[in-house]
């Protein structure tokens, strides 16, 4: 076996390889100094510490001395509303002044504003806008992003969002995992006919699946959005069609969406700021990943999800940006990690696990990405920081030094 690339003299190497089969949040391998990674083509072929075995080296092997830097798997942002038209900075002053969201909505703002902008945008306009976001994410060390639809809310514009996501996968290095989320809100044309829209979403499901445009189906199970019964109907059909499931749940009130996620065997339940003991118990007795979005709580000045309580109950947690034009207009997963430490009281190992192997589990990609292990994709991020603790302590800057995607250098500061 001959190496194309060797990264060596690594300071702290966070492989995120799980050391046992438990759901513990701190059970990941960390090589404390002088680590190395050997890469052949797009795969990792060796990981260790000390001197690299000569059997891997040829005169053509590229040797990169990382001079004691922090190295992790490529970060994974497992919950975003990536593709959307427009922005909502005009609502920011109203929010600061304390204007309620429903009042903003009545003035044509909120999700209705983004709905209009997304419907009016061409595919090319959405591509150009989203490419900028993906570049920001890559520069922050992110190599895989989940992307939801849900700002079209009709067949034509939901397909447009999903087609744009597919095209973007070919135009830049970040891997995109697509989620169909027409059940994000009820569009104005169905304002007085919620049942009609539920049926419309169910009709869209086979069309999206037939075109191979989405791997997951998500729904906003929330008071005055979609009930538990409506969510169950949509997600049951989706599951029968071969979609994997996600659920926005317990964001504003606890409606039973978390319990539904466990009942249906969803891959993840997301938000969870208002999760109850019943919901925690349901997740603890399932394999559902709790995908928490603390930058949304930060931006809305709302309560954070009870991460410590969930961790102590044996729940696996991922952290994501929730990047969207309303409640979290930020692509910065590094900041999310720092909030995770400071406000969710997560340890460095817990934080880094939540954006690597657990984030991979939240998009069902744990067999190929999310950890630095032999046989996995060589998606690797190098940070100009000596340790996980320093990275989390020194907030507000971009720590990324370089990013490797499938064994190729795709970003260098």
From Swiss-Prot:
<keyword id="KW-0963">Cytoplasm</keyword>
<keyword id="KW-0862">Zinc</keyword>
<dbReference type="GO" id="GO:0005506">
    <property type="term" value="F:iron ion binding"/>
</dbReference>
<comment type="pathway">
    <text>Amino-acid degradation; L-histidine degradation into L-glutamate; N-formimidoyl-L-glutamate from L-histidine: step 3/3.</text>
</comment>
<dbReference type="GO" id="GO:0019556">
    <property type="term" value="P:L-histidine catabolic process to glutamate and formamide"/>
</dbReference>
<dbReference type="InterPro" id="IPR005920">
    <property type="entry name" value="HutI"/>
</dbReference>
<comment type="similarity">
    <text>Belongs to the metallo-dependent hydrolases superfamily. HutI family.</text>
</comment>
<feature type="binding site">
    <location>
        <position position="322"/>
    </location>
    <ligand>
        <name>Zn(2+)</name>
    </ligand>
</feature>
<dbReference type="InterPro" id="IPR006680">
    <property type="entry name" value="Amidohydro-rel"/>
</dbReference>
<feature type="binding site">
    <location>
        <position position="79"/>
    </location>
    <ligand>
        <name>Zn(2+)</name>
    </ligand>
</feature>
<feature type="binding site">
    <location>
        <position position="88"/>
    </location>
    <ligand>
        <name>4-imidazolone-5-propanoate</name>
    </ligand>
</feature>
<feature type="binding site">
    <location>
        <position position="324"/>
    </location>
    <ligand>
        <name>N-formimidoyl-L-glutamate</name>
    </ligand>
</feature>
<feature type="binding site">
    <location>
        <position position="184"/>
    </location>
    <ligand>
        <name>4-imidazolone-5-propanoate</name>
    </ligand>
</feature>
<dbReference type="Pfam" id="PF01979">
    <property type="entry name" value="Amidohydro_1"/>
</dbReference>
<feature type="binding site">
    <location>
        <position position="79"/>
    </location>
    <ligand>
        <name>Fe(3+)</name>
    </ligand>
</feature>
<dbReference type="GO" id="GO:0005737">
    <property type="term" value="C:cytoplasm"/>
</dbReference>
<feature type="binding site">
    <location>
        <position position="326"/>
    </location>
    <ligand>
        <name>N-formimidoyl-L-glutamate</name>
    </ligand>
</feature>
<keyword id="KW-0408">Iron</keyword>
<dbReference type="InterPro" id="IPR011059">
    <property type="entry name" value="Metal-dep_hydrolase_composite"/>
</dbReference>
<dbReference type="GO" id="GO:0008270">
    <property type="term" value="F:zinc ion binding"/>
</dbReference>
<feature type="binding site">
    <location>
        <position position="248"/>
    </location>
    <ligand>
        <name>Zn(2+)</name>
    </ligand>
</feature>
<feature type="binding site">
    <location>
        <position position="81"/>
    </location>
    <ligand>
        <name>Zn(2+)</name>
    </ligand>
</feature>
<feature type="binding site">
    <location>
        <position position="322"/>
    </location>
    <ligand>
        <name>Fe(3+)</name>
    </ligand>
</feature>
<feature type="binding site">
    <location>
        <position position="81"/>
    </location>
    <ligand>
        <name>Fe(3+)</name>
    </ligand>
</feature>
<keyword id="KW-0378">Hydrolase</keyword>
<protein>
    <recommendedName>
        <fullName>Imidazolonepropionase</fullName>
        <ecNumber>3.5.2.7</ecNumber>
    </recommendedName>
</protein>
<comment type="function">
    <text>Catalyzes the hydrolytic cleavage of the carbon-nitrogen bond in imidazolone-5-propanoate to yield N-formimidoyl-L-glutamate. It is the third step in the universal histidine degradation pathway.</text>
</comment>
<feature type="binding site">
    <location>
        <position position="327"/>
    </location>
    <ligand>
        <name>4-imidazolone-5-propanoate</name>
    </ligand>
</feature>
<feature type="binding site">
    <location>
        <position position="151"/>
    </location>
    <ligand>
        <name>N-formimidoyl-L-glutamate</name>
    </ligand>
</feature>
<feature type="binding site">
    <location>
        <position position="251"/>
    </location>
    <ligand>
        <name>4-imidazolone-5-propanoate</name>
    </ligand>
</feature>
<keyword id="KW-0369">Histidine metabolism</keyword>
<dbReference type="GO" id="GO:0006548">
    <property type="term" value="P:L-histidine catabolic process"/>
</dbReference>
<dbReference type="InterPro" id="IPR032466">
    <property type="entry name" value="Metal_Hydrolase"/>
</dbReference>
<dbReference type="GO" id="GO:0019557">
    <property type="term" value="P:L-histidine catabolic process to glutamate and formate"/>
</dbReference>
<dbReference type="GO" id="GO:0050480">
    <property type="term" value="F:imidazolonepropionase activity"/>
</dbReference>
<feature type="binding site">
    <location>
        <position position="248"/>
    </location>
    <ligand>
        <name>Fe(3+)</name>
    </ligand>
</feature>
<feature type="binding site">
    <location>
        <position position="151"/>
    </location>
    <ligand>
        <name>4-imidazolone-5-propanoate</name>
    </ligand>
</feature>
<keyword id="KW-0479">Metal-binding</keyword>
